Every structure is written in C-alpha cells, then in structure tokens.
Amino acid sequence: MQYLNFPRMPNIMMFLEVAILCLWVVADASASSAKFGSTTPASAQQSDVELEPINGTLNYRLYAKKGRDDKPWFDGLDSRHIQCVRRARCYPTSNATNTCFGSKLPYELSSLDLTDFHTEKELNDKLNDYYALKHVPKCWAAIQPFLCAVFKPKCEKINGEDMVYLPSYEMCRITMEPCRILYNTTFFPKFLRCNETLFPTKCTNGARGMKFNGTGQCLSPLVPTDTSASYYPGIEGCGVRCKDPLYTDDEHRQIHKLIGWAGSICLLSNLFVVSTFFIDWKNANKYPAVIVFYINLCFLIACVGWLLQFTSGSREDIVCRKDGTLRHSEPTAGENLSCIVIFVLVYYFLTAGMVWFVFLTYAWHWRAMGHVQDRIDKKGSYFHLVAWSLPLVLTITTMAFSEVDGNSIVGICFVGYINHSMRAGLLLGPLCGVILIGGYFITRGMVMLFGLKHFANDIKSTSASNKIHLIIMRMGVCALLTLVFILVAIACHVTEFRHADEWAQSFRQFIICKISSVFEEKSSCRIENRPSVGVLQLHLLCLFSSGIVMSTWCWTPSSIETWKRYIRKKCGKEVVEEVKMPKHKVIAQTWAKRKDFEDKGRLSITLYNTHTDPVGLNFDVNDLNSSETNDISSTWAAYLPQCVKRRMALTGAATGNSSSHGPRKNSLDSEISVSVRHVSVESRRNSVDSQVSVKIAEMKTKVASRSRGKHGGSSSNRRTQRRRDYIAAATGKSSRRRESSTSVESQVIALKKTTYPNASHKVGVFAHHSSKKQHNYTSSMKRRTANAGLDPSILNEFLQKNGDFIFPFLQNQDMSSSSEEDNSRASQKIQDLNVVVKQQEISEDDHDGIKIEELPNSKQVALENFLKNIKKSNESNSNRHSRNSARSQSKKSQKRHLKNPAADLDFRKDCVKYRSNDSLSCSSEELDVALDVGSLLNSSFSGISMGKPHSRNSKTSCDVGIQANPFELVPSYGEDELQQAMRLLNAASRQRTEAANEDFGGTELQGLLGHSHRHQREPTFMSESDKLKMLLLPSK
C-alpha cells in the first residue's frame, strides 16, 4: 500500500490527453485523404511511394497500387492508374471558389503554379473570360475539363512534399482541333499551348471525370448546324447564315431593286423580239436573222430565272438550306431542286446565248462576203447541234463536280461562287472564246462592208449605199457594246478572284473579335475589307444590258410593219401586199426546182418575195449594186425554162464588183465557163416595127471546176484541182478542154467593143458619124426604154459599113423560138452569106428601108474563104482529138505552111505557147476584131452560142447583161494588133477543120445524127432578101 502515491494522478491524466489528441489527428488525416480521392494511403508521407522522373524534367510519373498484394501497375497498355505530378505549392480552396464552370471540384487543395497568375482572384477572372468559348460549340464541350485541370488542379503532399497533378498531352491535343480558330490568338496564353514539357504523355487526371454543361451557342452572323458541310472553317457546329454578312442590309435592298428593274426591262425587250418573230415566223425564219431570235429566247429564259426570286418566299428557298445556312456544293441529298433549276435556267441559257452570238457573227460574216443564202441555211442543223449540246455538257460537268453555289445578294445559284477555279474554267473560258471567235468574224465582215462603202461610187443606188452604212453602224455598235460588256464582266470576276481571300480573312478576324469581346459592353469589331457594291451593280448592269442590246436588232421599221400587219389581220382588216422578187432569185428558185421541171414538164415558181425580216440582216450584198428592176416581162418569163436547161445561166447579171456572178456548179463533171464582154444581135418585133437591140455586158472571167474523181476523194485532191483550174484561168491555158469556135468569135467581138469608143475612130462593124445622125437615132431610142430603136436610116448605114463582117458571125447559129402553149420549136440557119451592101446617100428623113444588092468583087472571094473557115470550125468546135490525130494534124499543117509560110508564121509564134494536151486555146486578150460600138449608146444585145447541145462536159453561156455605156470602156488596140488577131482566128479555124477531117468525127451532134443526117446539114443558098428577113425576124 506504500507504493500507492495518489498525488501522481495528474501526470497520468496528461498522458491520456496527449494520446487521445494523437489519435484524433491521425483519424482526421485519414478522413481528409479519403475525401480528396487520393490513391495514396495514409502513410503517403512515408518514403515507400515510388516517383519516376520523366525524361529529366521536373515531372514525375506516379504508379498506383494494383490491389491487396500491393503490386504496382507496370502494364504499358493500361494507363488508367498512372498519374503525373510536379512539385508545387498547395492552397486550400473556399466554398465560393471550389467550383469550375459550374461544377464542384472533388478536392479542397489546389495550386497556382501551372498558370501565370499570383492570386486566386485573377485566376477566377480569367477563367470567366473563357465562357466566350460557348460560341464555339465543339470547342466548348472539349476544353472545359482541360481548363479546370490547368487553372484549378488537384494538389496534395506526396513523400512529404506538395505535389500538383498534371493534365496529359493527349488531353491538351483534344482541344486543339475544335478550338483552332482561337488557338493561335492571344485568347489562348502560352501556358495553354500543348507542350510535352508542360503536359506529359500517357497520364490520367481526375478532372476528366467531372460533368460539365457542354451546350454551345453560335454567335451572329453564324447559325447552329449539324451538317458538317455547312460548318464555318474553324468553328464546328456553326455555319454562315444565308444572308451574306459581307453586305449590309441596305446594300441587299439596292441589289435586289436593281435586279428587279433591270431584269424586267431585259425580259420585256427579249419578249418583244420573240413575239415579233412568232407572229411573222414565215418571213423571219431565215439565217442569220433567226439567230437573233434564239439569242433573245435564251436571254428571255435566263431573265425568268433571275426574276423567280421575287415570288413569295422563293429567295430563301433558292439560296438557303433548311438549317438556315447558305447553299453550296449543290446538288446535295435532303434539299429541294429549286437551286438546281435556277442554275440551269441562268447558266445553261446564258451559255447557249453566247454560242448563238458566235454563230450570228459567223453567218453575218458570210452574208457580208456575198455567199448565197442556201449555203448558210444548210448549216442550220449544225448550229442547233452545237448551240444546245455544248452548254448541256458544261452544265452537266458543273453539277457532276457539285460546284453549284448559292448567293443571297443576287438571289440565284451559279457556278463557282466558292471554287473560283471552276468558275474561271466553266464561265470565263467560254466568254474568252466568244471574244476571240466572234471578234474575228465581226472584223472580217466589217472589213468587207467598209470596202463596199469605200467604193460607193460603183453603187448606183443611194438606198443601197445607205443600207451598207446602216448595216455597218448596227453591227459595229452591237459588236462594240457586246465586247465592252463582256470585258467589264470579266474584269468584275477577276476583281472578285483577287480580293476574295482578303474578304474571307477580314470576315474571319471579325468573327474572332466578336467571340473574344462577347462580354464587353461596347464592341469595336467590324469587317475591314468588304466587296464593293458598285462593282456588283456594274456586273449586273453589263449582264442585263447585253440582253437589251441583242433585242435592239428588232428595233427596226420592219418590226413595226410586222406588228401592223398582225394587228390588221386580227382586226379583220388585212391588206395583201405583194413584194416582187428580184430576177436572180427567181432564177435560183427555178434552178432549185429543176427536177420537177424535168419530171413533170411544167414548173410552178413564185414571183413574189416574202416581207423583210424584222431584224434586217437578210441583206444580199449582190443586190446592193443591182440596177435592174423587179418588173418581169412575159418574154423574160418565157425564156426562163431555157435558163434551167443551160448550165451557168445568168440573166440580168449586174456589173460591178459583185461576187454573185460566180459559177454555179450544176454538173457532176468539170466545168469551165469563161464569161467575157458580149455583143450580140437580138431581133424583136414590137407591134409593126422591127427593132434591133444591142446590149453590152461586162462580166468577170471565172473558172468553175469540179473534180471528176469519185465522191470519196480527199479534200487535198480537190484543193489541188481547184488550184490548177485557177492557174489555168489566170494564165489563159486550158489543160483539159478547148473553147469552141463560137466562144472564140464571141471573145473577138467582145474585146473589139472597147477598141475605139470615140466617134472619130472608125473600125469594123459600128461607126459613129455625124452629130445629126447621132441625134436621130438617139431620138428614136425614146420609143422604148432600154432598147436601141434604130430607124431604117441607121440600120441601112449599119449594114452598109459592117455587113461584110457581121453576117459571118451569124453563120451556123441556132436561132430558135419556143412557146409554152404548143411546145413547138423552130430552127432556121443562115449559112454562107456573101452579102455586100451598096452604099448610098440617106437623108435624115429617109425611112424607105434598106437597099441591098450582090456585087461580086475581090473582097467577096476573101470573104467566102473566111466564112468557110468559120463554118468548118463551128462544125468541129467541140471535137476532142487524140495524140495520134494531133500528130497527123501537125503534119498536114506543116504541108500547108510550106505553101503559105508568111501567113502562118505569126500564128505559130502567138499560139504555140497555148498548145497544151493536144488542144488549142487562144486567150481573149489576143483575139481582136475591128469593131466599133460607139454609135450604139445604151444598146442591148444577146446571143446564144450552141456548140454541143445538152452536153455535160463543156458549155459556153453568153447571157444577157445590164446596160453599160460603151464610151466608158477604155481599152484600145492598134491596127497591128487587130490584124494579128485576125490571123490567129484564121489559123485556128484551119487547124480545127483539118483535125475534123482527119478524125472523120465532125461535131458531136453530127456523130449522133449519122451519115445521112450529115448530108442534110449541107449549106443551102438563100436570096439576099430572105437572108435579111432571117436577120430581122423576131427570135427568142
């Protein structure tokens, strides 16, 4: 009991209190560790926790325990239990700041060492600024856990040191893609940039398990969308609204008003043209005028596509998608076809209009060159094929590449609003083609018309000259305006291409500024670089003005007359107006129906032309210089079927530089037609009087050749043959056929018309004498217009001076007359005429007629020989000779030359160079006969040279020409040249006669008739009075 010392009781109580306090501290530490979710056990301060340094950085990798056996996780494929830490200073969070973006943090200690802030208040203010990322929806959902792991990380003591848990590098990379629009801006500080030094790889973080509100909002001018194709670049979940943000609301109203007015005017203008063509389609359906109709039709349909946006709710339906974003990359699934329909209406028909414009320039160029209408009409099917198929190919290509984009400010869908390279290839490419091809044809056509205008003195009609001037002005103005509009449109497109990137970048900066300053009271964000509304207005004006310019082709008096006739017809007051057709068009119509004439024996043609087309482009350059009237006489109409039977038939051919007198290729075989100046005598009976009309025509020498080979021959062979024919015509050499004797004689007569135009020169047939006699026959001309009414005195003097020369040329000529009533045909021939006219004094008032008697003298003998040579040459004018016959011919000619060497020496000198292919051809420039036509002013003459009737190989056509003044024909020749020409003619006749006798062939007609018929063609002698009657009898 002694050891019990009660006074020591207070010491025991003190010891118990200390023990209880220690137990409470340990229990509290355990509870705190469980509260923060730490995997570190209560003995974390112990030295048994393993920390692995990461690549020599300040970061450590912490491996958690696997389970009861306390084995760590070293499996590299599972990083859920691997955490990364770094030494830091921890601070306890309060209840007010223990949240992050509205979610409560699962720990109470945090650290500021991962940021650049020094106080918790600064950190919270900056964290609130990141609420602006809600306007980048995809970014907002991905970046909230990362921001909480950086701004408010978990912090605790490990092995006795404060350690902060780090977010992983993968966690940082997740936020880069949806937040890329702001990632490289000042909105994201450097400590938020993904870096493996700051954020180790393959680490877990507790913040990833936190729940956040990830709902984002799209900031105007963006709208939310779930279609990835509609996302604005850099802002996933939002797309640009349908209304173009680069233009203000006021600018939208201006553009819509301009499209409405300009489109309506263009629509009405094109509708007027289309209606004008429809009401008079029969007269207007001719090229190139009908091309204007198709151009205006294309612009009309395109204007309809432009104006459809003004119907109720159509604009939004055309250019906007269902989610409110702008349409692009159409066609797409799930959307209506309104955008595609508008695209086809606008793009397809505008492109077709451009192609038709090129064809307009092409056809107009050919018309200005003077080519016939049929040559252009035959290409009509090709025009349609190209004009409608080429735009179709471009349209299908555009839709196949999904390059149809909408544009809200213009209210249509078009090609390449986003992909400018596609717009350059599918729009600007065809425009450049229009400029190049159309400009080429317009330039050539204008040069031709300017050439006609320059030589306007050759055009006798003032209206024709004014018509050329009007055509030049119309086409020139149209071409100039079209060129300007296309160039301005191309310039507008190029301006858009150049500045599109600047506008896009400026809009992007505007979006970033609005997102960054969303919580500012007064925002200073605006689009720095925007497209000019003036350029867009100019572009639209050029487009619609082009359609209006194309409609001006119908702003002519012809269109007004067309509407007048239409209105009178609808009101029951139609007036039949007949428009007479020019003679050359009647001949062309007759030739086109020659098959009907051959099969049925009768022909029905139209002598009245249609009215002028509304455009006025169906002009004929060949008509501009024509001085003939539209009056068609019965004689001319009766002779018209004969024109069909003859190749190269031209009646009423005009003089001048017209190109319509080119040869008509009417035969399958090669044709060579040489048209020279003709003088022929036509005897007509008008009432009781007998008249002799002399007509002078000047026609260009043309060679029309067609290959004899098969139709399948190459084009190079045809070009070579045409080149040879042209060279032969230019040099006067003919390698395949020779001219008939009648053709040579016609050339002789024609060239001597112009030898002595003055009265003082007396050569050959016609002589110009005293002024009284000139006045006398001039007065007689007044009896009948365009005919030389010669009284007996003039005719007597004519025969006295020239009878010994003109009658031989009438030898062997078929003077025929035909009648449509009884289909009768009579033919008489005047052969071997040896007439000498007795010269006598005739007073001015002497009208007793002509006194003729036969006086044999020395001249008659020479004339008989001359006539025999001509007769023999006419009988063998179309005979072909073989090489052997040519040799025998040359032998016989050598024998005859020995008898008369002096007469034939000049012939060999002048004609040997024209011998080619065993045929002889003497050019018209070297065959001259002493003629003088000075006394027959304003006279008319027609003759027919019948070599080989109905032959398909060679025909010579001497046709009626318009009147010309012989005094204006300047060329003259000397006496030596005339004598030389006569020698050439005589020698040619002798050689042909010898060749005919050698071959026993005669003419082709004689060969067909046979021996008995040949005897019937022997010359018969007639009395002088009968011969003169045959000369003066009327003949058609």
From Swiss-Prot:
It is found in: Cell membrane; Cell projection, Cilium. Expressed in olfactory sensory neurons (at protein level). This is Protein smoothened. Residues 678-745, 870-902 are annotated as: Disordered. Its main location: membrane. Disulfide bonds join C90-C155, C100-C148, C139-C179, C172-C194, C218-C238, C242-C320, C339-C413, C513-C525. Residues 1-31 form the signal peptide. It is a multi-pass membrane protein. Interacts with cos. Phosphorylation by CkIalpha and PKA regulates smo accumulation at the cell surface and its signaling activity in response to hh. It comes from the Eukaryota. Segment polarity protein required for correct patterning of every segment. G protein-coupled receptor which associates with the patched protein (ptc) to transduce the hedgehog (hh) signal through the activation of an inhibitory G-protein. In the absence of hh, ptc represses the constitutive signaling activity of smo through fused (fu). Residues 880-899 have a biased composition (Basic residues). Residues 280-287, 361-381, 443-469, 554-1036 are cytoplasmic. GO terms for biological process: adenylate cyclase-inhibiting G protein-coupled receptor signaling pathway; anterior/posterior lineage restriction, imaginal disc; blastoderm segmentation; Bolwig's organ morphogenesis; central nervous system development; commissural neuron axon guidance; compound eye morphogenesis; eye-antennal disc morphogenesis. GO terms for molecular function: G protein-coupled receptor activity; identical protein binding; patched binding; phosphatidic acid binding; phosphatidylinositol-4-phosphate binding; protein homodimerization activity; protein kinase binding. SUPFAM superfamilies: Frizzled cysteine-rich domain (SSF63501). InterPro entries: Frizzled/SFRP, Frizzled/Smoothened_7TM, Frizzled_dom, Frizzled_dom_sf, GPCR_2-like_7TM, SMO_7TM, SMO_CRD. Residues 85-206 form the FZ domain. Keywords: Cell membrane, Cell projection, Developmental protein, Disulfide bond, G-protein coupled receptor, Glycoprotein, Membrane, Phosphoprotein, Receptor, Signal, Transducer, Transmembrane, Transmembrane helix. Disruption phenotype: RNAi-mediated knockdown severely reduces adult survival following the ingestion of E.carotovora. Abolishes Cad99C-dependent formation of endosomes and DUOX-dependent up-regulation of reactive oxygen species (ROS) in the intestines of adults fed bacteria-derived uracil. The modification Phosphoserine is found at S658, S659, S667, S670, S673, S687, S690, S693. Residues 32-258, 309-339, 403-421, 491-532 are extracellular. SMART domains: FRI, Frizzled.
